From Swiss-Prot:
InterPro entries: TIMP-like_OB-fold (IPR008993). Its main location: secreted. It comes from the Eukaryota. GO terms for cellular component: extracellular region. Keywords: Secreted, Signal. Disulfide bonds: none annotated. This is Uncharacterized shell protein 6. Prismatic layer of shell (at protein level). Expressed primarily in the mantle with highest level in the mantle edge and lower level in the mantle pallium. Residues 1-26 form the signal peptide. Coiled coil: none annotated. It is found in: Secreted.
Length: 146
């Protein structure tokens, strides 16, 4: 009976400890507006993902999305010569999830490993973007420019 009580306490302690660790190392983004996120990144475009695959970058697991791009709002350093992005597989590492064939506004940074999009960048389903912001980004050519 004592052994069962101790094992229950140990399992409870490990569960609480795991939650604390996950919460501590969870993705932590600065409080920025959509425009600030857009200006901070190397590329921003509107399009829909038509291909998804798992890939490994520097021994870490990533998801690779390739897009049909409808409109480019920002493309610093020709990042979009390849219309694909990679994002960390784990959402704790700021990875994002994109549904295939749904329009999204996608932004991120260009690295030697490719175009990286994370949760702290402006990555949002286009239908979830309020009309005011859609109007701004579509009609102001300098919306994403610093």
């Amino acid at each position: 009976m004592l052994f069962r009580f101790l094992s229950v306490r140990a399992v409870f302690f490990l569960a609480v400890f795991s939650v604390v660790i996950l919460w501590t190392y969870a993705c932590d983004c600065p409080d920025e507006t959509r425009q600030q996120k857009c200006r901070r990144t190397d590329f921003t475009f509107l399009g829909n993902a038509n291909f998804v695959a798992l890939t490994s970058v520097q021994s870490s697991l990533y998801i690779r999305y390739c897009f049909s791009i409808w409109r480019v709002f920002k493309d610093r350093s020709f990042a979009l010569s390849s219309p694909c992005i990679v994002t960390p597989f784990d959402t704790i590492a700021c990875g994002i999830r994109i549904q295939l064939y749904e329009p999204y506004i996608v932004s991120g940074v260009h690295t030697r490993s490719g175009n990286i999009a994370q949760a702290c960048d402006w990555n949002e389903r286009w239908s979830d973007v309020p009309f005011f912001y859609r109007f701004q980004v579509l009609n102001q050519p300098d919306y994403c420019l610093p």
